């Protein structure tokens, strides 16, 4: 069943919907125990399906970068962020950004079902390091020593395990016959 958000008194709460959502659940997850929360994003699935088809027809490669997981997981990742802090998504609606983690494993399966080459899904920090972010940051810092601390801080935000380096993932797709992607 779909989870719905409904008003309850002065706040909002999640409740089970009345309509089955079997068509939206990825095939690999249809045998989950009743009551298991399985997040799906039909919009992301449709986008990857379309991009994979275009890559096969027109050639090329695509990168998808966002926070999420590269293995199938159950449970809710819904969160609200206001002023860089996590807040209750059901309090003061409209005053926070709502978000959920990307299910890269399902998106990779969709792309491969269209004949697309999956280059991999790796943590952003590893991908950037494989592409040479450390050397680039060092070169920038040497060229502008007055900005060396800011450059190092910006690099650490992108690659640090406690920052964006592990939470954010990079998924690469390419047309068949395309060489392996750099960074993967």
Describe these PLM feature segments.
Residues 24-184:
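Long, Lys/Arg- and hydrophobic-enriched amphipathic alpha-helices
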């Amino acid at each position: 069943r779909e989870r719905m958000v409904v008003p309850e008194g002065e706040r909002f709460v999640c409740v089970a919907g009345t309509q089955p959502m079997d068509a939206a659940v990825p095939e690999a997850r249809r045998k989950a125990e009743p009551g298991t929360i399985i997040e799906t994003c039909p919009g992301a699935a449709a986008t990857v399906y379309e991009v994979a088809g275009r890559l096969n027809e027109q050639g090329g490669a695509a990168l998808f970068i966002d926070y999420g997981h590269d293995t199938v997981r159950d449970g809710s990742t819904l969160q609200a962020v206001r002023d860089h802090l996590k807040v209750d998504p059901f309090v003061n609606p409209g005053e926070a950004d709502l978000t959920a983690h990307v299910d890269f494993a399902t998106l990779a399966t969709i792309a491969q079902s269209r004949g697309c080459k999956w280059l991999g899904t790796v943590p952003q920090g590893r991908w950037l390091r494989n592409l040479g972010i450390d050397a680039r940051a060092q070169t920038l810092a040497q060229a502008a020593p007055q900005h060396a601390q800011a450059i190092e801080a910006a690099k650490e935000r992108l690659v640090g395990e406690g920052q964006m380096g592990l939470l954010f993932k990079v998924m690469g797709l390419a047309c068949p016959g395309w060489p392996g992607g750099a960074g993967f």
